């Protein structure tokens, strides 16, 4: 048992916190006995502390006014009542008894400095002893820092709106300039390579950097990279038009590739920080309902921003020329930066500075710092990449993660850059393209609500399987429509797009459920490293398909790319079924609450 701080104090106002009586005579007697019941969620431990007569002198120094606050129990080291009784019956001469010096003047603020990495949890649940199941549910559904969490939502709303608008803007502008998939495919391929190489390094960098200053710096760098990209595309509209293959050697295109890689790495780093670190601290790691609700809200914000961003730029592109639209996007990027910075600062302020807590213990930080001084940056980077891939392969929920990665092979039957370029070259109205992306996001928002009900009905693992099979079935219909009819007519085209829109319901359902599976199976101490490495693996899968798209860059080869995308979704469904039908002992332990065998 780890006790962060013990205060010798008792007051009638705190009687409701403790349901055991304190008798002065029993502490002053030769044989002192106290019984403390520790209740936290569904786990309960009884500790019976019996002292020998030789210990009575130390107990005499205790006051009857006693309370225990900020306690945290590591369940791996909690022993049973019998084990403690046996240890305490051992003769005193065989075991040294530590003397605890208690200071009644320690303030609550000073006690927070005693927290280490394993105790970065709010202490409300651990300070309340015996609670009813209804009271536990109410507290578990209450965020630890609700004000800070709401400000974080506002920050994500501003940042995601700009990012989603730009993700739709640049492929549309390039596709209107060059009637080929080659520039967009090369741009996506290079950015994915940057994520593959830099993902684990960025993840570990975020683990050893202060949260707020690092996040603000990433926002500034990302905004600068996006403005540079917009400037390069605007410059491409001012120079004489050349072939799609010749622009790959233009200086402005190299600058565009560099800016796109920086933009992607900054986006990955900030996304991992919010989803795997910040939201856990603000919602409370020991408040599962509040954490689940926070995750759902973040998904909805991202999808709603995708709807607003794509539709806004699509409407602008249908009324104005691409250069004017790109200038508007660049202005929006620069204008949103001060707002995001202020919201991030307010998030930390309203959460009582919880984001200022260090993310590693003193020993691990000092060890990392000494190794940084002795090793080169290249060696540290290579070791980080190897460690990330090793931890990723050894994670207990690898099949679920591989299914998630395989979905990234689907690069054309999705509202992405290649689909945008394909529809643009088919002379589809930009407002229709924006509406298609927006409807796909609407299906994602609906999936965040339906997935919770699906989990309650069939369990978390079966809910993931349902989402994957639903997506595979609808994409099979879409591919059949594409291969059997011409998309030059409106009816087949709209039916083809509608199947893809409906398939997003299954895709996003698995995204929400899969995130919960990974949060359950991945240790919190490795969440950032494994999460960033998983994104790198997913980027590797996407880059392989982009490489195929570069080889088959003509729009007539779109059907071949669509078939490959369908096969990747089918393979993801089959791999996930292996986790569902043949779980390991470790997986059974992790998902003991889930009806695996039903």
UniProtKB/Swiss-Prot annotation:
Transmembrane segments: 182-202, 216-236, 252-272, 297-317, 326-346, 402-422, 432-452, 463-483, 493-513, 530-550, 557-577
GO molecular function annotation: iron ion transmembrane transporter activity; transmembrane transporter activity
Effect of a null allele: No visible phenotype under normal growth conditions, but plants are resistant to several aminoglycoside antibiotics, such as kanamycin, streptomycin, gentamicin, amikacin, tobramycin and apramycin.
Tissue expression notes: Widely expressed.
tRNA-binding recorded as keyword: no
Cited Pfam families: FPN1
Compartments where located: Membrane; Plastid, Chloroplast envelope
GO cellular component: chloroplast; chloroplast envelope; membrane; mitochondrion
Induction: Down-regulated by iron deficiency.
InterPro entries: Ferroportin-1, MFS_trans_sf
Chief location bin: membrane
Transit peptide feature, positions: 1-54
Annotated keywords: Chloroplast, Ion transport, Membrane, Plastid, Transit peptide, Transmembrane, Transmembrane helix, Transport
Membrane-protein topology: Multi-pass membrane protein
GO biological process, alphabetically ordered: intracellular iron ion homeostasis
Functional summary from the UniProt entry: Probable plastid transporter that may play a role in iron chelation, storage or sequestration under limiting iron conditions. In presence of exogenous antibiotics, may allow opportunistic entry of multiple aminoglycoside antibiotics into the chloroplast.
Protein family per UniProt: Belongs to the ferroportin (FP) (TC 2.A.100) family. SLC40A subfamily.
Protein name: Solute carrier family 40 member 3, chloroplastic
Organism: Arabidopsis thaliana (Mouse-ear cress)
Gene: IREG3
């Amino acid at each position: 048992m780890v006790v962060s701080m013990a205060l010798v104090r008792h007051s009638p106002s705190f009687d409701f916190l403790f349901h055991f009586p304190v008798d002065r005579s029993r502490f002053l007697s030769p044989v002192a006995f106290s019984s403390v019941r520790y209740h936290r969620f569904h786990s309960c431990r009884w500790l019976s502390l019996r002292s020998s007569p030789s210990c009575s002198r130390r107990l005499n120094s205790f006051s009857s006014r006693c309370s225990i606050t900020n306690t945290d129990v590591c369940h791996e080291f909690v022993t049973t009542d019998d084990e403690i009784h046996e240890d305490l019956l051992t003769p005193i001469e065989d075991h040294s008894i530590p003397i605890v010096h208690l200071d009644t003047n320690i303030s609550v603020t000073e006690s927070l400095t005693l927290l280490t990495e394993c105790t970065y949890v709010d202490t409300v649940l651990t300070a309340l002893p015996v609670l009813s199941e209804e009271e536990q549910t109410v507290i578990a559904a209450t965020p630890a820092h609700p004000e800070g969490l709401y400000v974080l939502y506002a920050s994500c709303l501003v940042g995601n709106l700009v990012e989603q608008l730009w993700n739709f803007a640049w492929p549309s502008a390039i596709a209107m300039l060059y009637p080929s998939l080659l520039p967009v495919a090369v741009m996506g391929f290079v950015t994915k390579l940057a994520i593959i190489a830099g993902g684990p390094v960025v993840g570990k960098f975020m683990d050893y950097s202060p949260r707020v200053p690092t996040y603000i710096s990433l926002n500034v760098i990302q905004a600068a990279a996006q403005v540079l990209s917009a400037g390069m595309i605007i410059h491409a509209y001012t120079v004489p038009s050349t072939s799609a293959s010749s622009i790959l050697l233009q200086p402005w295109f190299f600058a565009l590739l560099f800016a796109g890689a920086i933009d992607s790495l900054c986006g990955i780093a900030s996304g991992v920080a919010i989803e795997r670190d910040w939201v856990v601290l603000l919602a409370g790691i020991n408040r599962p309902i509040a954490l689940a609700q926070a995750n759902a809200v973040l998904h909805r914000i991202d999808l709603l921003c995708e709807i607003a961003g794509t539709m806004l730029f699509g409407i602008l592109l249908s009324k104005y020329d691409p250069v004017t639209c790109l200038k508007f996007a660049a202005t929006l990027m620069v204008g949103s930066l001060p707002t995001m910075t202020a919201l991030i600062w307010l998030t930390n302020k309203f959460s009582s500075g919880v984001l200022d807590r260090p993310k590693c213990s003193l020993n691990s930080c000092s060890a990392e710092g000494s190794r940084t001084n002795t090793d080169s940056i290249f060696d540290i980077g290579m070791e980080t990449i190897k460690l990330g891939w090793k931890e990723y392969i050894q994670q207990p929920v690898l099949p679920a993660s591989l299914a998630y990665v395989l979905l990234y092979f689907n690069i054309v039957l999705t509202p992405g850059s290649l689909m945008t370029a394909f529809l643009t070259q088919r002379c589809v109205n930009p407002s229709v393209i924006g509406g298609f992306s927006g409807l796909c996001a609407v299906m994602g928002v609906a999936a965040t609500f339906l997935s919770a009900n699906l989990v309650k009905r069939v369990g978390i693992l079966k809910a993931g399987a349902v989402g994957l099979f639903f997506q595979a079935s609808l994409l099979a219909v879409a591919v059949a429509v594409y291969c059997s009819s011409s998309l030059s007519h409106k009816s087949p085209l709209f039916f083809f797009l509608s199947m893809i829109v409906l398939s997003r319901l299954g895709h996003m359902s698995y995204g929400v459920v899969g995130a919960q599976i990974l949060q359950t199976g991945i240790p919190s101490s490795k969440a950032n490293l494994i999460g960033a490495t998983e994104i790198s693996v997913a980027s590797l899968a996407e880059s392989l398909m982009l490489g195929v798209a570069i080889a088959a860059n003509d729009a007539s080869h779109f059907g071949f790319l669509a078939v490959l995308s369908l096969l990747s979704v089918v393979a993801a469904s089959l791999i996930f079924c292996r986790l569902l039908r043949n779980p390991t002992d470790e997986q059974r332990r992790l998902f003991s609450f889930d009806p695996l065998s039903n």
